[in-house]
Amino acid sequence: MSKTHRILFSLIALFLTVATIAQTRTALGRSQASINPDFETSGEYDSTQTVGEFYGTPVVSQPVAEVIQPAHVLGSTNENKRIEVDLTNQRLSAYEGDQKIYEFLISSGKWGRTPTGTFRIWSKFRYKNMSGGSKELRTYYNLPNVPYTMFFSNDAIPAARGFGIHGTYWHDNFGHPMSHGCINMRTEEAGLIYEWAGPVSGTNKYTRTTTENPGTEVVIFGVAPRE
């Protein structure tokens, strides 16, 4: 093989490598499912769709039991509440002022990055169908009736991006990144945060923030482990 041919083959190999990396990054960048904030307003359990798929494995959703809040948080106001998510240690903490009310393990983004910054919950769904990822990269997911979903946003990360905190029935690997960008929690623990955080939802299956019923602040920081 001549020197010219070797150079040509090297350039072709380099081009293919760059193209593959770009394709992978593009697929990962869109792995988090988007949402239409003005169209999707149902938080009801969909009994016609109970079987989904996560990472090539069939998964089945179940209706969740009603969460009973501990007495010490009943009647508390939203003004001094905040949620902190530590990506480095894969933990979520809920505060009222300086008092820590809850601390739970979570799973943040693995196939898609969880954004960092200060956000506000803008809507809550008792149940929410979610799908996204990439079949080519084998990260596709189709998850019906995701429980206790709390979507958050800020000026840089709009509501349509679909980032949220929610319960999880398709894995039990908390403490390790396992999501496409959202914050995965054990379902019963997500239920406690859901009932505690604003906007106050009461018996409503879907609630959106208003001036009179604001969403709780969510602060996300750190760097998730690479696993």
Regions found by a protein language model. Give the residues of each.
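Gly/Pro-biased beta-strand-loop elements
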Residues: 56-173, 227
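N-terminal, intrinsically disordered, polar/charged segments of Gram-positive cell-envelope systems
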Residues: 28-76
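Exported/periplasmic cell-wall-interacting domains
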Residues: 2-37, 125-128, 132-227
